[in-house]
């Protein structure tokens, strides 16, 4: 095939993608905004929300906008699902809440994966895009602020549930009802996923503009302050319970590494209960000489 020196296959393809495409299976034109799929999802409006080809300051700006717009949509969904969680906890519908918590966890974990796409952008390219972002910062994100607010409401709903059941977080982990323990673990999954997303954002900032006291984000704050935000929990009482459990932990009642456990009922003694009566288990007598390091 002979082409002129100025012919560009890429340019031809780019132009084709900007026009309606004929789907031979459907025998219909897709992209005119007339098909049910396009009408329902409002694809003409959705796909026009990004800067046009001639408006972008860099090729990667399309990726930058798409990822951030997608994050806002997912955060909107996570926030609305969290509102439903509040309603479910308030009516003691723990099975329904458990299923919805799994959904929220998957959504928030997906946010971290999406940010990974932006890591393919080199820092010099981002510095070009950055000039056109004004003073914008992640703190201005409607989705981020919505989800934080929704999570606050969920934390209060959790407290109301515990009050109705006459339970505390610490008591639940010391032999309380299994359904509440499962709920605690799933709430922690959400919190851990959220903090993981914040950490992914921190790492993205680190590899694009750097993290240092001398490096200012667009809002004027040093990027170093992002490190502290990563560990701010959504459900503090669940994390505090870990600290309290460890503070009241007792070494007595375990088994010396490598020693026989014959005659000892597995799990018969709580790590937080008073020590067993001497002689209840033949292995308890020699524990004082056991190694004392966590591994």
Where are these regions (language model features)?
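Surface-exposed peri-terminal alpha-helical interaction modules
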Residues: 1-295
């Amino acid at each position: 095939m002979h082409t002129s020196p100025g012919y560009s296959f890429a340019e031809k393809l780019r132009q084709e993608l900007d026009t309606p495409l004929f789907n031979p299976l459907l025998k219909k034109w897709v992209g005119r905004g007339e098909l049910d799929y396009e009408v329902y999802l409002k694809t003409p409006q959705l796909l026009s929300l990004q800067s046009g080809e001639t408006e972008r300051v860099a090729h990667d700006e399309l990726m930058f906008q798409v990822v951030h717009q997608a994050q806002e949509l997912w955060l909107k969904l996570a926030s609305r699902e969290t509102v439903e969680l509040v309603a479910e906890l308030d009516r003691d519908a723990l099975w329904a809440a458990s299923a919805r918590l799994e959904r929220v966890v998957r959504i928030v974990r997906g946010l971290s994966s999406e940010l990974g796409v932006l890591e393919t952008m080199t820092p010099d390219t981002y510095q070009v895009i950055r000039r056109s972002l004004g003073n914008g910062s992640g703190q201005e994100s409607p989705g981020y602020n919505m989800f934080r607010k929704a999570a606050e409401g969920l934390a209060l709903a959790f407290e109301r549930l515990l009050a109705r059941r006459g339970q505390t977080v610490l008591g639940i982990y010391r032999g309380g009802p299994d359904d509440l323990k499962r709920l605690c673990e799933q709430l922690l999954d959400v919190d851990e996923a959220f903090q993981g997303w914040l950490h992914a954002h921190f790492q993205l900032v680190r590899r694009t503009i750097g993290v240092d006291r001398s490096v200012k984000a667009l809002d004027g704050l040093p990027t170093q302050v992002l490190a502290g935000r990563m560990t701010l929990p959504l459900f503090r009482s669940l994390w505090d319970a870990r600290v309290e459990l460890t503070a009241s932990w007792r070494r007595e009642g375990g088994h010396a590494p490598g020693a026989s456990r014959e005659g000892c009922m597995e799990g018969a003694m709580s790590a937080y209960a008073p020590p067993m009566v001497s002689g209840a288990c033949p292995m308890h007598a020699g524990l004082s000489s056991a190694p004392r390091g966590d591994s």
